Regions:
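AMP-forming adenylation/ATP pyrophosphatase catalytic core
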Residues: 1-152
């Protein structure tokens, strides 16, 4: 697998709707309109935790980057009402050791706003006032997907 990818990517939704990060991760970022139809659709629980109020994120946080963990990172898990070191959260959540150094994160400085597989931090979920919803998702690219990508 090519590891010549940058250690982090500036998060510009309209420039990078699809992204690749070290460790074989491939992801997507979408901006969804929060209209009536969106709210009444049956949405998978996994998708809900990967959605956040776009205006809230872009108003409260600057210099967003997609990256892996760094020393000093902190995360506020949704519904827990507290912030804790990302390292400690990963231990408690049972994140496999082999994924911890490459797991995709959306960060602003040392504050982690989204963790792949866990979702967005506390206070970022869309609500009835949300007009635009950010949807992030990522997974490890399979060997077959890599082969198909390079064959194009």
């Amino acid at each position: 697998q090519p590891e010549n990818l940058p250690p982090q990517l500036p998060f510009f939704l309209f420039i990078y709707p699809e992204f690749r990060l070290r460790g074989g991760w491939k992801g997507t970022a979408e901006l969804l309109r929060a209209d009536f139809e969106e709210k009444i659709q049956v949405v998978h629980k996994k998708d809900l935790k990967n959605r956040a109020d776009y205006a809230r994120i872009t108003t409260l946080y600057t210099s967003l980057v997609l990256r892996a963990r760094q020393p000093g990172d902190r995360f506020r898990p949704a519904g827990r009402g507290l912030s804790k070191p990302l390292r400690k959260w990963m231990n408690e959540a049972g994140v496999p050791n082999e994924l911890r150094d490459t797991l995709p994160l959306l960060a602003s400085g040392s504050e982690i706003l989204w963790v792949c597989g866990e979702g967005f931090a506390d206070g970022l979920a869309p609500d009835t006032e949300s007009r635009w919803i950010l949807h992030l998702d990522a997974e490890i690219e399979t060997q077959e997907e890599k082969t198909n990508e390079y064959a194009r």
